[in-house]
Amino acid sequence: MTMIFFSKLNRSISRSKGFLYGGGVRSAARLLTSPGLEAASVNEVEGGLGFIRRHFASLASRKGLVNNDLIGVFANPRLRRFFSDEAPKKKNYENYFPKDKQEPKSDQKSEHKEGSEKNENENVGDMFMNRFQNLLIPLLALAVFFSTFSFGSGEQQQISFQEFKNKLLEPGLVDHIDVSNKSVAKVYVRSTPKDQQTTDVVHGNGNGIPAKRTGGQYKYYFNIGSVDSFEEKLEEAQEALGVDRHEYVPVTYVSEMVWYQEFMRFAPTLLLLGTLIYGARRMQGGLGVGGTGGKNGRGIFNIGKATITRADKHSKNKIYFKDVAGCDEAKQEIMEFVHFLKNPKKYEDLGAKIPKGALLVGPPGTGKTLLAKATAGESGVPFLSISGSDFMEMFVGVGPSRVRHLFQEARQAAPSIIFIDEIDAIGRARGRGGLGGNDERESTLNQLLVEMDGFGTTAGVVVLAGTNRPDILDKALLRPGRFDRQITIDKPDIKGRDQIFKIYLKKIKLDHEPSYYSQRLAALTPGFAGADIANVCNEAALIAARHEGATVTMAHFESAIDRVIGGLEKKNRVISKLERRTVAYHESGHAVVGWFLEHAEPLLKVTIVPRGTAALGFAQYVPNENLLMTKEQLFDMTCMTLGGRAAEQVLIGKISTGAQNDLEKVTKMTYAQVAVYGFSDKVGLLSFPPRDDGYDFSKPYSNKTGAIIDEEVRDWVAKAYERTVELVEEHKVKVAEIAELLLEKEVLHQDDLLKILGERPFKSAEVTNYDRFKSGFEETEKDSAATPTVEPVVDDGAPPPFEPQVVPT
């Protein structure tokens, strides 16, 4: 639409210029001549008057057309939005996604006022950039528009000096010449030769200076090298034609501004300036000063300010302590900070001081950040959260500046709470290496230490931080006075998982009460963190929707657990009959060996459906959460793990690579027993745990001790495999029956195994997780209350055993 407008405007101006420089003006000049000449040229004047009337009539009609075109063009809403610097109005998406509640107007006004005061300087940069972007394209369009008038309209024709002399000057068609900017000669021609025209009188201004000639029509132009050369050639040409010196073609020198050339002179500067501004705006997202494209509107000069997420009592979608489960002890610790901020007088009367900080420590997914969000929802005081990586930047000095800005904001809003997520990004121990990035991180850490406990600290600001690597933090950061408390958030036990499942199951449409599923699912998911439980509930709902289920059932939850543990089910994977038979006998060996071992975990189901990237089948057990493991328990677990390889050797007669993962687990467990737990008599009561950071370049024992460890591990694994082969030989028929049934059904549950193997010969005196899975907590608690059980002897002072690790040789 814009190009159509410029095209029409160009044609209108071209037509009007023909009138301005043509016969219309000449006729008008004749109207202004002396009365003595009127009679001599009455016919020509009458023709001129008629010509003027016709041109004025056509000009009026063209003006009306141009006005109509302009009105039509600028009435286009797209063009008006294009040239407008106002933000576009939001579309009515609320019709499809209605809001539950409307915010109070007073809150909106207060939030708007607060935001306007905060971003007053930021809006100036946004306004300038928006104005520049809105004007950039129109300026380019105007440049193209003016380029059409750089040397006149499209009716002018460029000629050479030789053509000018032969075709225009010699016939006497040249009225006068205007030399523009000493570079272009504009030729104004007559409609008839000079010897056939009446004499034109040129009036002056009364001072002897003739006025500028207005006769002739501008139709041709040519470039000149220099003024002197042009005048010399023109004089020679007229002299050769025998023209009297008093009748030489008048030459006028004019200075004109060609907008196109002027614009092109400044175009490189404007282009460079626009590129720099555009690049700076695009870099705002990468500089940590806003989202992509500068969403938060902070310029590069405000890069020293921290990107803070604020929450207060007016915030939406709050999380409360009732929404957090599975970490009651940690929740009690963190609630004391909230109570102190709400009612400090109660503690001050007793002489107590609020701890300055608390460090939330725990594995990933246990709810550290969720607990911090609940603290923000319950406290009712300003809550400022930031990530540890937000302090680090490509510019030197940005980290300390952001730390100062963060604590300055917190002190202005005191009492307040600061939460730094993943503080290990800046809190690593100092003194390791001296590179530039390390120096910048150390400067940030030093500034954080000073702000938390230094000369300029003030009361009323509590600092919370979360990390899953407390071992690498600097000792100065962990001392009392900075982080007074370390709150450990472990993976939930079976009771904690039950509480977490109840929270997430409330949002799902079930065929039973949430408590019915929570008790059983908690028994099926040992070692799951809160994030894993949330994933299981979501996967179960997705599976139910995929199968067009009206409600979510236990089968959907079991499929979701299999999905989380084993990976995606791949029924379409092409497996040969021999491979499928090998997998069936392998999994059958695991099931039978574990069934007849006292300390093995109860089997829940076994399947030969491929899952994930490598698993062609697996057996699922319901393990108990034991804090201590005996040598006999670990030996039975080793035998159960080797059951698949033993079944392949005894029943098929050939072994395969399917036991690779089993052998890896066996090696890890056996090395841990010999080199970590001190179970070997030859090695003695020594423990060589591997380093957690992975920098295990040297062994903490001699080569002789390493050889003893290797020999002892081989002997233990050989004994376990010998016992496993004996069990498979003893129950060979049952192993084959289960394998053939697996080939038929692909999935076998414990009820199917009971029909072939019968009841397990061993019965635990205590309630196991499998019992809780079958009947739920409430019934098992009644049974355990009626049946006296032997209390296990637990040494409260003994630390839990290490996770089995591999000691490389």
Curated annotation (Swiss-Prot):
Its cofactor is Zn(2+). It is an enzyme of class 3 (hydrolase). Induction: By heat and high light. Residues 93-122, 776-809 are annotated as: Disordered. Signal peptide: none annotated. Its EC number is 3.4.24.-. The keyword Transmembrane applies. Coiled coil: none annotated. One of its GO terms (cellular component) is mitochondrion. It is a single-pass membrane protein. InterPro entries: AAA+_ATPase, AAA_lid_3, ATP-dep_Zn_Metalloprotease, ATPase_AAA_core, ATPase_AAA_CS, FtsH, P-loop_NTPase, Pept_M41_FtsH_extracell. The active site is at 587. PROSITE patterns: AAA (PS00674). Zn(2+) binds at residues 586, 590, 662. It is found in: Mitochondrion inner membrane. Binds 1 zinc ion per subunit. Residues 93-121 have a biased composition (Basic and acidic residues). The keyword Nucleotide-binding applies. Keywords: ATP-binding, Hydrolase, Membrane, Metal-binding, Metalloprotease, Mitochondrion, Mitochondrion inner membrane, Nucleotide-binding, Protease, Transit peptide, Transmembrane, Transmembrane helix, Zinc. Pfam families: AAA (PF00004), AAA_lid_3 (PF17862), FtsH_ext (PF06480), Peptidase_M41 (PF01434). One of its GO terms (molecular function) is metalloendopeptidase activity. Probable ATP-dependent zinc metallopeptidase. Involved in the assembly and/or stability of the complexes I and V of the mitochondrial oxidative phosphorylation system. HAMAP family: FtsH. This is ATP-dependent zinc metalloprotease FTSH 3, mitochondrial. It comes from Arabidopsis thaliana.
